[in-house]
């Protein structure tokens, strides 16, 4: 009997191993055959810059990375990304060079004693003073979610900064976290309390809620207050701009975008709350077929337009904060992994800022 039980256990173990081999291919966990059209079975995630880079020439020590965006200029392109504790935006070029693109990406004042939330970075405690989200407007100008500065700003062609939003009804925002720009120039962004020391209990908090906002032609509108009970974080528009997705608190919400840019019919699109692996919605993007990509438990989730979880791009170093479609063909995803940059090639081009489909 014991031998029979042992044989049965061995068969079950082998069967489980076969199941894992079938569902996990390299850096991809495949939950649906439809994923093969999106990312090839032999696709590999490679660390291209940071303290875990394989090439010594690509070693670079970052603080805490976020909010990448790819900028394509003719045949050449480069990646911009935030280092929040350093309060800078870095520029990475395909030859592996890193340079400072913008100083004081978030907090731009002189007394930072109460600016930016505190966070643990390994054994270090850091202050999130910088921007946490980047995108481009239809004119190709850089737009920043200035978390530590509690403002949304735009970098003009001459290098000056324009404040697009820093107050709602005279009260300071808590800390813009991420943003997306519609083809008509409307900027949608999420706001939370991460721009202040002490966050929700900060004596410098002026708005008693987290929100989703839209700013267009100099007018700021509050679209959703504490949307369906989540703390809003990631945000992205569908390729046809009919839907707006908002992620946070282990849920992804979907809203209908009205003709005036406001939102309606908010509902839970994906619920990750039952997952036992760490991670949740933060960075979010879409590809040209309408698939949604979101950070989540275990890495980056790839979700069909119908809300089905097709698979996960597994990421090292304790998770991924955000990502962006890059390269000239928009078929590479560049990830910010706290202290490293990584890349993987895809089969379907992503939707990039300032190049949205009609």
Regions found by a protein language model. Name each.
Residues 1-4:
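Positively charged n-region of N-terminal signal peptides that target proteins for export
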């Amino acid at each position: 009997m014991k031998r029979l039980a042992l044989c049965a256990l061995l068969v079950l173990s082998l069967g489980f191993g076969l199941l894992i081999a079938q569902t996990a291919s390299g850096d991809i966990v495949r939950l649906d055959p439809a994923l093969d059209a999106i990312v090839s079975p032999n696709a590999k995630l490679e660390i291209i810059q940071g303290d875990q880079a394989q090439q010594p020439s690509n070693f670079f020590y970052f603080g805490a990375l976020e909010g990448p965006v790819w900028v394509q200029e003719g045949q050449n392109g480069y990646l911009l990304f935030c280092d929040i504790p350093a309060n800078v935006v870095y520029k990475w070029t395909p030859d592996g060079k890193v340079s400072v693109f913008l100083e004081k990406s978030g907090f731009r004042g002189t007394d930072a004693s109460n600016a930016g939330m505190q966070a643990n970075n390994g054994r270090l405690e850091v202050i999130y003073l910088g921007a946490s989200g980047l995108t481009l407007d239809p004119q190709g100008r850089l737009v920043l979610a200035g978390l530590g500065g509690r403002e949304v700003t735009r970098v003009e062609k001459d290098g000056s900064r324009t404040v697009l939003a820093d107050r709602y009804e005279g009260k300071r925002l808590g800390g813009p976290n991420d943003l997306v720009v519609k083809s008509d120039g409307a900027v949608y962004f999420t706001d939370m309390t991460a721009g202040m020391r002490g966050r929700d209990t900060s004596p410098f908090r002026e708005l008693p809620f987290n929100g989703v906002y839209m700013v267009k032609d100099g007018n700021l509108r509050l679209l959703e207050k504490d949307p369906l009970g989540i703390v809003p974080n990631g945000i992205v528009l569908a390729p046809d701009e009919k839907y707006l997705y908002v992620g946070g608190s282990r849920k992804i919400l979907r809203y209908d975008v009205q003709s005036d840019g406001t939102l309606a019919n908010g509902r839970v699109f994906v619920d990750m709350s039952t997952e036992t692996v760490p991670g949740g919605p933060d960075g979010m993007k879409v590809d040209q077929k309408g698939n949604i990509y979101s950070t989540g438990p275990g890495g980056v989730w790839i979700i069909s337009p119908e809300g089905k979880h097709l698979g996960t791009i597994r990421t090292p170093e304790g998770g991924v904060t955000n990502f962006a479609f890059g390269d000239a063909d928009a078929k590479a995803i560049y990830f910010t992994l706290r202290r490293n940059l990584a890349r993987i090639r895809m089969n379907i081009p992503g939707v990039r800022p300032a190049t949205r489909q009609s």
